[in-house]
Design a protein with these regions (language model features):
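Fold-level signature of zinc-dependent metallopeptidase catalytic domains
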Residues: 21-39, 43, 51, 157-293
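A broadly conserved detector of short glycine/acidic/proline-rich loop/turn motifs that flank catalytic sites
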Residues: 10-11, 120, 141, 212
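N-terminal prosegments of processed precursors
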Residues: 20-154, 282
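N-terminal regions of proteins, emphasizing targeting and processing segments when present
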Residues: 16-18, 55, 165
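Bacterial Sec-dependent N-terminal signal peptides
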Residues: 1-25
Length: 293
């Protein structure tokens, strides 16, 4: 009986350690989801149901990443681990890949972006953004769904890992174009674009002026210019993911210009943009042009 019990215990330990690995950065979270106060992004309609939860030891993770930033760290790389959608930890070699032009990056040194190449999975590439508000990642895999990590708990200590697919019907609209048809059409067009974009060799960098509505700023907790870092952290998260796609498909990288902070707004009553219901109908196009020119 003792041998059977011992064998059962060992099997359980092996299964748990294999399914939910732990290192100095990440540990599997076994806390009941119902007991976690979640980040408001978790309530969005498109939020996935099939997720894995991990707790992040933020400061050591940040320290390793920040060891490869700045002029003194030029051409240096670091090795980090992140969890995947299967609940396993993977290693990546990472380098800094800033989305801010130099003057803006110098002013906000705690908001950073990184690119990584898979060690565990050689086909995987990583885009990672980090700020005092937490970490977000996007992983591209050959022949598999993209994967994401983003804060799950309100205090941004617990993170969710999930694949890019979603359940149909979760959003008020669905794409009805057949996957095979759209895949073939896009592949033909993208092949031409990629050849043209990459004919010059290296990834091209373009300067981006970005303006946001007051509602956008307010959503991320910023109600005045003194809290602009909250907005820039959110913009950096989005740019990191967008640049991951642009770099892969178009050999193009966007850098946010420092003057963008002059066209970030905080008061919905005085910003130059229409309410969402009107703006999304086309009004924002003209309003944005007037703001940036």
């Amino acid at each position: 009986m003792k041998k059977i019990l011992l064998l059962t215990t060992l099997l359980v330990l092996i299964l748990v350690s294999g399914y939910a690995q732990t290192d100095r950065f990440w540990s599997a979270n076994f806390q009941s989801r119902s007991s976690i106060t979640t980040d408001k992004a978790v309530s969005r309609q498109s939020y996935p149901t099939d997720i894995k939860l991990f707790r992040l030891n933020f400061l050591p993770f940040q320290q390793v990443l920040f060891s490869v930033v700045g002029k003194q760290a030029a051409n240096k790389s670091a090795i980090i681990s992140i969890p995947n959608a299967a609940g396993m930890l993977e290693e990546f070699t990472v380098v800094e890949a800033s989305n801010f032009e130099a003057a803006l990056q110098e002013k906000f040194p705690d908001i950073r972006s990184f690119s990584g190449k898979g060690i565990t999975d050689k086909s995987a590439t990583l885009k990672l953004s980090i700020s005092p508000q937490g970490v977000q990642t996007m992983v591209f895999r050959s022949g598999a769904d993209d994967e994401f990590i983003e804060p799950y708990s309100k205090d941004h200590t617990i993170y969710s890992v999930y694949k890019s697919h979603r359940e149909k019907g979760k959003l008020p609209w669905n794409c009805t174009t057949e996957d095979q048809k759209i895949s073939i059409a896009l592949s033909e067009k993208m092949g031409t674009l990629q050849l043209a974009a990459r004919s010059g060799g290296d990834v091209k960098t373009m300067r981006l002026a970005q303006s946001v509505t007051a509602e956008y700023s307010n959503y991320f907790g910023a109600t005045s210019a003194s809290q602009v870092s909250l907005v820039l952290a959110a913009i950096n998260n989005t740019l990191t993911r967008c640049n991951g796609v642009y770099e892969k498909d178009l050999a193009l990288h966007l850098n946010l210009v420092a003057a963008s902070t002059n066209v970030i707004y905080y008061n919905p009553a005085t910003d130059p943009y229409s309410a969402a219901a009107t703006g999304a109908g086309g009004a924002w196009n003209r309003e944005l042009q007037n703001t940036l020119t």
